[in-house]
Amino acid sequence: LMMLSMVFVMITMSAESARRIAEVLEQKSDLVSPENGVKEVKDGSVRFDNVSFKYSKKAEKYALADIDLDIKSGETVGILGGTGSSKTSLIQLIPRLYDATEGTVYVGGRDVREYDLETLRSEVAVVLQKNVLFSGTIKENLRWGDPNATDEELERACRLAQADDFVRAFPDGYDTYIEQGGTNVSGGQKQRLCIARALLRKPKVLILDDSTSAVDTKTDALIRKAFADEIPDTTKIIIAQRVASVEHADKILVMDGGKILAAGTHEELMANSEIYR
């Protein structure tokens, strides 16, 4: 009898869990492609026109407020700010992971809501601080960026991301097996492989969300130089903790409390912004 009662309780709990999972799976996203969505992104320009955003309609506080921003195609833009300053919230609106609550976000001169979602997201690559490597060879992991990439394209992407040297140092090179989650490579190596994977997509906008945090300053500088020399037409948006990672950017934004408090070049901000200094 005790066994039967335990089985009954487990069945009841399982049924409730299954019901909740079904609710999640059946939930429809508000983010859908429009009918006849635009299938080409002209360039990597990005513009925020009086954008405010909150994660829930019921939320009282805005995560972003009154954001006006104009990034020309091919520019490098750095974003600095403390934890909770909504740097990541800002960049998530570009590939339309969320929609702005108020105002409009433009990519390539068009409202992001006009694009076919797959098209937009194929042209806006985001590399997170904690990205994911899958179990499989380095080649297989990189080809998540472009399944049809040639070996030469893989190697070029890794050279730009400063990953080629350490990959070639492995006995099996690009055929080295990566454990689930990338546990057999260092944090900095993992970040560089994830950057290389994003580069294989040849995006018009490349966003690095603190994704060189585990990389030493010398390698970080080499990555920035490679970007400037080899992909000048790609718009680069770099969220960083180190000023050195963005001091050579065309524009640097200083954020706090969901607002842009200061913007300009490193020299302009050093001269005019107390919070930056």
Language model feature labels by segment:
Residues 34-39:
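Short, solvent-exposed loop/turn elements at beta->coil junctions and helix N-caps
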Residues 1-24:
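Cytosolic ends of transmembrane helices, especially the final helix of ABC transmembrane type-1 domains
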Residues 23, 30, 143:
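Conserved E/DxxT/N motif and adjacent residues on the DHp alpha2 helix
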Residues 5-6, 33, 88, 105:
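Residue-level detector of alpha-helix boundaries and kinks
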Residues 11, 28-31:
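Signal-transduction coiled-coil helices of two-component systems
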Residues 31-32, 168:
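Transmitter module of two-component histidine kinases
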Residues 40-277:
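ABC-type nucleotide-binding domain
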Residues 7, 27-28, 272:
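Generic structural signal for alpha-helix termini and adjacent loop/cap motifs
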